[in-house]
């Protein structure tokens, strides 16, 4: 009676040996192991041995197919249960932002923001704004300076006092008393929420988070994030902002990522 037996070999062929019946049909193979199946003829039919040890030709073929599946490389499109399959086998990319490379600088801009030609500040070279809300925008301004480093302006708060035009100037100059914590005759206020400094590429940077409010309560105020540095006699400023209401409805992510992504190129 003919039967088929499978033997596991390493680099060199070894003497086949009978092994007891195992529960798993497909063996675990390492890259340097080879599964060999050969047919042998038994001298006499032994039903017990056939039932416990012998492997039928059909089962041997199943073993080979299973072993091939184990040894094959899993494609990127395969996914475990409960996971989404990447059918094209390509890594996912963040489509929420696009890279902008300017003259001496670079930053990440929200993909849904469009360029705008409006010039609001001295030295402004770039402006992008939200398609649906112009209050959410980013500008980049480059102006000459005699400072060698951003730290020559003093602390971040002292620097802000020298570029306070970024926060908008009060146009009203009459007598008034507004509620909401405004000083007498003032219709606008700016609160510095956070300041920090860091060194990127050997250059110091200032980061400031400012909340500006007006007496009319428009948008509940504006969150303005400023990134600034100095290089080769030029002051680089990036300011990204969003209205207070939209800030807490998802705009925070886009404004923060845009402002913190700014750096010299």
From Swiss-Prot:
Family annotation (Pfam families): PsbP (PF01789)
Domain of life assignment: Eukaryota
The organism of origin for this protein: Nicotiana tabacum (Common tobacco)
Induction notes from the record: By light.
Boundaries of the annotated transit peptide in chain numbering: 1-79
Keywords: Chloroplast, Membrane, Photosynthesis, Photosystem II, Plastid, Thylakoid, Transit peptide
GO biological process, one term: photosynthesis
MF-aspect GO terms: calcium ion binding
Presence of the UniProt keyword Thylakoid in the record: yes
Full protein name: Oxygen-evolving enhancer protein 2-2, chloroplastic
Record localization: Plastid, Chloroplast thylakoid membrane
Family matches, as Gene3D superfamilies: Mog1/PsbP, alpha/beta/alpha sandwich
InterPro entries for this protein: Mog1/PsbP_a/b/a-sand, PsbP_C
Protein family according to the UniProt entry: Belongs to the PsbP family.
Task performed by this protein: May be involved in the regulation of photosystem II.
GO cellular component, one term: photosystem II oxygen evolving complex
């Amino acid at each position: 009676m003919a039967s088929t037996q499978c033997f596991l070999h390493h680099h060199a062929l070894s003497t086949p040996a009978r092994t007891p019946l195992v529960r798993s049909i497909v063996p675990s193979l390492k890259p340097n192991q080879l599964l060999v199946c050969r047919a042998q003829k038994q001298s006499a039919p032994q039903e017990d041995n056939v039932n416990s040890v012998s492997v039928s030709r059909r089962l041997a073929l199943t073993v080979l197919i299973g072993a091939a599946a184990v040894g094959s490389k899993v494609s990127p499109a395969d996914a475990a249960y409960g996971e989404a399959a990447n059918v094209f086998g390509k890594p996912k990319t963040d489509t929420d932002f696009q890279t902008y490379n300017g003259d001496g600088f670079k930053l990440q801009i929200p993909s849904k923001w469009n360029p705008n030609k409006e010039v609001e500040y001295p030295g402004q070279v770039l402006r992008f704004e939200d398609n649906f809300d112009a209050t959410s925008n980013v500008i980049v301004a480059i102006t000459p300076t005699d400072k060698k480093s951003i730290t020559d302006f003093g602390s971040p708060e002292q620097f802000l006092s020298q570029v306070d035009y970024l926060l908008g100037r009060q146009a009203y100059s009459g007598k008034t008393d507004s509620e909401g914590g405004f000083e007498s005759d003032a219709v606008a206020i700016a609160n510095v929420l956070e300041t920090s400094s860091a060194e990127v590429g050997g250059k110091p940077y200032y980061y400031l988070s400012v909340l500006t409010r007006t007496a009319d309560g428009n948008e509940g105020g504006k969150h303005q994030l400023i990134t600034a540095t100095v290089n080769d006699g030029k002051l680089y400023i990036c300011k990204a902002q969003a209205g207070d209401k939209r800030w807490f409805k998802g705009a925070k992510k886009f404004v923060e990522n845009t402002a913190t992504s700014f750096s010299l190129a």
